[in-house]
Amino acid sequence: MFEKPVVKTFQYGNHTVTLETGVIARQATAAVMVTMDDTAVFVSVVGKKEAVAGQDFFPLTVNYQERTYAAGKIPGGFFKREGRPSEGETLTARLIDRPIRPLFPDAFKNEVQVIATVVSVNPDVQPDIPTMIGTSAALAISGIPFNGPIGAARVGHIDGQLVLNPSQTELNASRLDLVVAGTESAVLMVESEADNLTEEEMLAAVVFGHDQQQVVINAINEFKAEVATPAWDWVAPEENTALKTKIAELAEAKLVEAYQITEKMARYDRIHEIAAEVNEALLAQDPEADTKEIHTIFHDLEKTVVRRSIIAGNPRIDGREKDMVRALDVRTGVLPRTHGSALFTRGETQALVTATLGTQRDAQIIDELTGERKDHFLLHYNFPPYCVGETGFVGSPKRREIGHGKLAKRGIAAVMPSVDEFPYTVRVVSEITESNGSSSMASVCGTSLALMDAGVPIKASVAGIAMGLVKEGDDFVVLSDILGDEDHLGDMDFKVAGTSTGVTALQMDIKIEGITKEIMQIALNQAQGARKHILSVMDEALAGARDDISEFAPRIHTMKISAEKIKDVIGKGGAVIRALTEETGTTIEIEDDGTIKIAATEGAAAKEAIRRIEEITAEVEVGRIYTGKVARLADFGAFVTVLPGKDGLVHISQIAEKRVEKVSDYLTEGQEVQVKVLEIDRQGRVRLSMKEAVEKPAEEAAAEAPAAKEE
């Protein structure tokens, strides 16, 4: 029934990788099953042969989905099936999309969809690298115009050594988690989180990963040759040189002037005016002219004008030199009732960032294929439409917002205290209130400030900077602190976050081939200077964490009890702990080893909760006097509660010095009495005495008198 499948197996570091096609999903344009040491991902690619008429963008969609059966699990929840993509799935989809998107021809507008499904998972092999390899292989054998293949590698830094594709266990001990993807000749994408590594160490890791992934590229080329799918007969549409010349005559000089307007919204208004004038003039000449084609050529002209000016060494769009950072304004404690807040403004980019402290119960529970884990540091990034002066839909976070939030979190993670050092769950929210480039790096700066304002003892201040590149032939200019237009019209988006001593996160997206090690080195060095400048301004506003947390934040008090006593504090069906939390207004968390964490905004409430827990867990001591309450009477004596849940018997002979005929003549239920513990027998029964308790104070006074004299 099946033709013989094509299988390619190769060694990639410590892992064996297998590519297979020809058995599954034969109606797709291309489909590949990639296996890497028991982690298997099925990748399909479907491309439409025809583009939608008049479409002026490339509709590439990447869907990444993890099936729970891959780990031998059934989904939790009511519906028992996978739902919308998780944050992790969204981030992996972006990781796949970023290096492949620049490799399709500029004029190619046919719809392409990549669907990657994780069907088997080895807990020690993360699915993202095999997924990227499988996507590259599927596109390579699809016949779709694609200037690949690409390779992908994860790089760790363990004991001073770079490690290729470290296992999950190794990654836990690594100072670096870096993913790099690229073609045979160029790096296209880097995503990383680091523990204060130097610029030289980061660059070495990028180069190492790119060198190692050549094995993958060679294997995919051999796989492609064996499959031998005919290439599509797609030809790029001819350039309308006549229209291009007309638009240049009408708009070029005006655009040069417009791009000297330094204020973003005023510049945009002028560019829109010029575009409208061009449209009007061309439609007057030819009412049948294609307005979408006019728009595309006009946009290309904008790009040419800006790039030519930068390469010529002229001041940038907003008047800065290539290595200048925009004006900074840093404010902390801007919101009165939040636990920590900061307003970070860099030029026309602004982030209002808040930090909120919660208990460990507030931690995010993340159910992954490899198991459940808790995240005690959350960072959420919001990009509302008003921040760029637009109207738009406001709803659940988009892929871009999730990706930018994750990048900012990576930048801060290395300086966060451990849960043992700071037993709080911390949630940071970055509201982008103005945007003109590098809002994710503004979020890093604002997060660092908001955390310190909240009293979180971070190890060092962190700042972030976005670098850009314009390259024409052998000429290139590296730009510091890029604007939105420079990002859009340039060749590289290179974001670096770090402290004064090292890099904590690096993200790089390159739109062209030919980015050399030299260019990356210049960008990293230029970024270091900019980062240190920003840190110096931040330190003037707030140089370290505040001495105390906000008065509105919960204070966590820790105590330890015997593990055997946990059941007493919880009570039957949770009755005791529920009563404790409701009556004291605290949040109480109990760990299996007997550690109890009590969170309260008021100290008195925490003290009361501690006192009551101590009462519940206290042991009755022989010889000690207690103030107890009569629980019930019997003919032979009275049962007295000396501690919560702990009763003892006062025998009728121990009630008073004289003979007692009837217990009720001396005691009533609910009466408070002083009792001394005489004995606890093998069965745990407590024998009490009232008459011994009466004699004790006189004995104590006699014993303490000499001690007072000695003082």
UniProtKB/Swiss-Prot annotation:
It comes from the Bacteria. Residues 623-691 form the S1 motif domain. Its main location: cytoplasm. Pfam families: KH_1 (PF00013), PNPase (PF03726), RNase_PH (PF01138), RNase_PH_C (PF03725), S1 (PF00575). The keyword Cell division does not apply. Mg(2+) binds at D487, D493. Its EC number is 2.7.7.8. It is found in: Cytoplasm. NCBIfam families: polynuc_phos (TIGR03591), PRK11824.1 (NF008805). This is Polyribonucleotide nucleotidyltransferase. The gene is pnp.
